[in-house]
Amino acid sequence: MVFRIASSPYTHNQRQTSRIMLLVLLAAVPGIAAQLWFFGWGTLVQILLASVSTLLAEALVLKLRKQSVAATLKDNSALLTGLLLAVSIPPLAPWWMVVLGTVFAVIIAKQLYGGLGQNPFNPAMIGYVVLLISFPVQMTSWLPPHEIAVNIPGFIDAIQVIFSGHTASGADMNTLHLGIDGISQATPLDTFKTSVRAGHSVEQIMQYPIYSGILAGAGWQWVNLAWLAGGLWLLWQKAIRWHIPLSFLVTLALCATLGWLFSPETLAAPQIHLLSGATMLGAFFILTDPVTASTTNRGRLIFGALAGLLVWLIRSFGGYPDGVAFAVLLANITVPLIDYYTRPRVYGHRKG
């Protein structure tokens, strides 16, 4: 009898890359819907802009590299990159910003390294950080959520603001950014950091309209819960593994709790960290990128915990209010080292 020994891999996953990417896109629907509800139609316009620009940029590079355009675009990775960047920037940011960010993400952060599977850094976060460093004012100019907002532009007005800087009635960005009593509204994390530096007490800060939510900032808590719902669905579909989200959230919660207990007058409470900013989006949709995250189970736990620690440190002591994007990229740098020291021992061989 002749036995044929096939080469590895010996187990096969029937789900192709395009299907996994499609599942992630579908899981993003609750988060997108929440952002549309609280921040207006600008989010949808940015998603459409980002989708078109990422596809065009990827097609151009593939054409120059003489690779199959149609086959590569079908993997949906470019669409996901555009989506993640679009939901991370303010809804009424100028059109050229999302185009610049997505083009940089696709061409420099992805295709320059060889395309999908070769890039060491998350492309969407590279694009986001480039925009944040280059245009900090525009990237931190979020509308107040509709619960406390005076002006939330409709679909047509959102298009006009994004492309021309003002609505049909003449309202410019400064007018639209004004919230209750003419006070400019930022994100809960940005408001907290700015107010603490100005010498305000936590008790005073918690009286601001932006913190009128039940658990955290108005609107932002529901946006984060919506992204959490999508992330749990991804876990149920087994499109992602639990190690990174769990270790990230547990570490962030633990650091925030300890910091708040030791310094309640200067550091934010744990619920603000967990339900504000890009916490849930980062935990389930960004950090779990299979290309740029650790590949071993122990490594995933370390990777997620490191990102959680970095997010808390940047939010609490850094110069930027959120920190998820920087934490992701810094954690990406450590992946080769983490994988090297957490690689499983080959059966029958001694360690070392």
Curated annotation (Swiss-Prot):
> Which topology term describes how it sits in the membrane?
Multi-pass membrane protein
EC code: 7.-.-.-
Regions that span the bilayer: 20-40, 42-62, 89-109, 123-143, 214-234, 242-262, 267-287, 301-321, 322-342
According to its UniProt record, this protein's enzyme class is translocase
- Top-level taxon in the UniProt lineage: Bacteria
Q: Which residues carry this modification: FMN phosphoryl threonine?
A: 187
A single GO BP term for this record reads: electron transport chain
UniProt subcellular location: Cell inner membrane
Q: Name one GO cellular component term.
A: plasma membrane
Do you know which InterPro entries this protein is assigned to? NqrB/RnfD, RnfD_bac
This protein's record includes keyword Transport: yes
What keywords tag this UniProt record?
Answer: Cell inner membrane, Cell membrane, Electron transport, Flavoprotein, FMN, Membrane, Phosphoprotein, Translocase, Transmembrane, Transmembrane helix, Transport
Q: Which cofactor does it need?
A: FMN
Any one Pfam family here would be NQR2_RnfD_RnfE
Quaternary structure and partners: The complex is composed of six subunits: RsxA, RsxB, RsxC, RsxD, RsxE and RsxG.
Recorded family membership: Belongs to the NqrB/RnfD family.
User: Could you tell me what this protein does?
Assistant: Part of a membrane-bound complex that couples electron transfer with translocation of ions across the membrane. Required to maintain the reduced state of SoxR.
- Listed name of the protein: Ion-translocating oxidoreductase complex subunit D
Annotated source species = Shigella boydii serotype 18 (strain CDC 3083-94 / BS512)
